[in-house]
Amino acid sequence: MSGARCRTLYPFSGERHGQGLRFAAGELITLLQVPDGGWWEGEKEDGLRGWFPASYVQLLEKPGMVPPPPGEESQTVILPPGWQSYLSPQGRRYYVNTTTNETTWERPSSSPGIPASPGSHRSSLPPTVNGYHASGTPAHPPETAHMSVRKSTGDSQNLGSSSPSKKQSKENTITINCVTFPHPDTMPEQQLLKPTEWSYCDYFWADKKDPQGNGTVAGFELLLQKQLKGKQMQKEMSEFIRERIKIEEDYAKNLAKLSQNSLASQEEGSLGEAWAQVKKSLADEAEVHLKFSAKLHSEVEKPLMNFRENFKKDMKKCDHHIADLRKQLASRYASVEKARKALTERQRDLEMKTQQLEIKLSNKTEEDIKKARRKSTQAGDDLMRCVDLYNQAQSKWFEEMVTTTLELERLEVERVEMIRQHLCQYTQLRHETDMFNQSTVEPVDQLLRKVDPAKDRELWVREHKTGNIRPVDMEI
């Protein structure tokens, strides 16, 4: 696939990546490397190179194929007078009548009133007011419209400043807790950012109902809770090993004390030697367990306890960062709703004054209409600006969510691997302790094999004999 070209779907800052490629939505990139893992390397038309998420771009059908820019189709396809063609951010072409401000997905025919495709229904816009549709979007879309931060959402979704209509936008998107998603009834199949993995960055975009209350918990909050739970589990494992160490130390002390016990110290012969070695082996075993407990402390317990000492503080900063972006998004959404309401009121006022003009023509009414038209236009501009700021805020939140969830994913893998390695070290030390313990009883085994009751009896008799002349019968 190297050498193929792609078009960017979303803006990407690349600020948090050392070799990230910064781009806006709609730019062309030539692919240089396309390894597995979800990150590709590419080169922009200005020569800048860098890495970017593969899910942020859409491959063109063939290497070198570039969709024509807005308005270019009119050079190859003859349109009726007054019509211009444009591309939506999803690549679907639509048409605008510069005279009537009518917008349609169907290519107009040269004959007035006849669609390009027989039997097709033209999806045209409602009447415009001062160059703005009912949704507050301009009838003539600028070529550099800012795209919303949604992943693939289909041809007929809200197109930002080039939306066909408010009704169509409402049917294709749904806003939940100030985050805009594709409508579930019309949602096209979305490509996962990391389709071959159950990655955090793909499954925690929505909020979840709080089982302990009537509120909701953000998906990112669930990930943070898992991270903090992992830190707590790591701490409890360290405490468990500490208890294990305490048991080893107490066991070693008791073994050493028992080895000094004088019970059966008067046993003699080869059995006495074996018994003495049994007591000595207890002292040796006590030393082995003391060393085992010391290694457990330095090589298992301490690393588990000290791993990521500032983890909670770091997670708190991360939580605040994403929460601030979410608050900003909520603020932008409130501004959009306020601007939308203001536009509706201005349009209603303009419509009312227009009706008054039809009833009674007067200079005062015409002046009122001009003022109402200016206010309606300003309200449309305000709504466009608010929607653009909202989309920018959602784009920033989207990018930070992807980056941060992937970082949390990496941290979780790192934590699990660290614990696994130290538990392996624990089992290794345990095996070594068993071997050392075995070595302490080997001398005992050797002496026990040498125990000879007959030899012991001989030695004892030689040392304690009282005479070998046996008694005889008494004579009369």
Swiss-Prot record:
Gene that produces this protein: GAS7
Major localization listed first in the record, in broad terms: cytoplasm
UniProt source species: Homo sapiens (Human)
Protein name, entry field: Growth arrest-specific protein 7
Record has Zinc-finger as a keyword: no
Parts forming coiled coils: 309-419
Molecular functions per Gene Ontology: identical protein binding
CDD domains assigned to the protein according to its UniProt record, in alphabetical order: F-BAR_GAS7, SH3_GAS7
PANTHER family: GROWTH ARREST-SPECIFIC PROTEIN 7 (PTHR23065:SF57), PROLINE-SERINE-THREONINE PHOSPHATASE INTERACTING PROTEIN 1 (PTHR23065)
Residue stretches making up the F-BAR domain: 196-456
GO biological process, one term: clathrin-dependent endocytosis
Domain SH3: 1-62
